[in-house]
């Protein structure tokens, strides 16, 4: 069983879900855990609500393949919490997706975490540790890179909320991956996903060595070739590879009670 813990729905006409599913089938992915972001950030209430509707529709259209994360902007506090609860109760979404709308240690995130704990729902957080010279280049895309959460902050968050399960997103797409891995060594409830375009030699091996394979989940962030190459090319045991590719995420899905 191969589970992609970090995938996205994007926007037509450049993205076709049917076409994307064909490619994921060719790569052998059994289940996709997807979220949809808004075209511009920070997102507003109508934006993230519409994005979640699209995810819910995809789940309904492809119930055997697609599971959904609820994406919200925590800055909208009450409305964000209401939307997250709706996604959990009405659509049985697997968890919460947080992006760059605010940093993960913002107090407004705490009620969302408490709700996630209630439903045993994992929390996937966009993560990066960027060198200063890259910040300006990323400005047009991220809107405000100063609100990007770091692995160190996620580790801190995990210690504050020991009953929650956090996933630090795309270790291969967040800048200094070695720093990120080291920051997640201590808390047992903070995992990382392997997504991103980075395929640096030794990245996956270091993650397994420092964190243990049980704290790593496979993610592509829709970058399929690089996503698989770094896992199959890594010098790790077959047992650890199986855990990363799907075993660990299946445990989270079973704990949540999603198909």
Question: What role is predicted for each listed range?
Answer:
Residues 94-95, 109-215:
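Catalytic pocket-lining loop regions of alpha/beta-barrel enzymes
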Residues 1-13, 52, 56-70, 185-188:
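Mobile, glycine- and charge-enriched loop segments
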Residues 2-5, 33-36, 69-71, 97, ...:
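Active-site neighborhood of phospho(di)ester-bond hydrolases with catalytic His/Asp-centered motifs
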Residues 1-8, 16-31, 85, 206, ...:
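Mid-to-C-terminal alpha-helical segments outside catalytic/metal-binding sites
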Residues 46-134:
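Active-site gating/metal-coordination segments in enzymes
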Residues 10-13, 39-42, 74-78, 103-104, ...:
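Active-site environment of divalent metal-dependent phosphoester hydrolases
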């Amino acid at each position: 069983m191969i589970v992609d813990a970090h995938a996205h729905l994007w926007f037509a006409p450049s993205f076709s879900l049917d076409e994307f599913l064909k490619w994921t089938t060719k790569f052998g992915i059994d289940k996709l855990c997807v979220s949809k972001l808004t075209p511009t950030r920070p997102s507003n209430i109508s934006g993230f609500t519409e994005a979640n509707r699209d995810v819910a529709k995809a789940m309904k259209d492809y119930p055997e393949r697609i599971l959904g994360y609820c994406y919200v902007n925590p800055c909208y506090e009450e409305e964000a919490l209401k939307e997250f609860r709706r996604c959990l109760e009405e659509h049985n979404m697997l968890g919460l997706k947080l992006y760059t709308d605010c940093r993960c240690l913002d107090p407004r995130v705490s009620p969302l975490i408490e709700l996630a704990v209630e439903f045993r729902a994992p929390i996937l957080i966009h993560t990066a540790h960027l060198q200063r010279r890259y910040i300006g280049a990323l400005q047009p895309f991220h809107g405000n890179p100063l609100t990007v959460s770091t692995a160190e902050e996620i580790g801190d968050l995990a210690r504050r909320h020991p009953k929650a399960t956090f996933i630090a997103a795309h270790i291969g797409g967040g800048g200094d991956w070695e720093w990120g891995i080291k920051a997640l060594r201590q808390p047992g409830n903070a995992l990382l996903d392997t997504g991103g375009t980075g395929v640096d030699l030794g990245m996956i091996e270091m993650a397994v060595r420092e964190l243990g394979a049980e704290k790593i989940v496979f993610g592509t962030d829709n970058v399929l070739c690089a996503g698989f190459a770094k896992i199959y090319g890594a010098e790790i045991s077959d047992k650890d590879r199986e855990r990363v590719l799907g075993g660990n995420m299946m445990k989270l899905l079973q704990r949540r009670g999603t198909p």
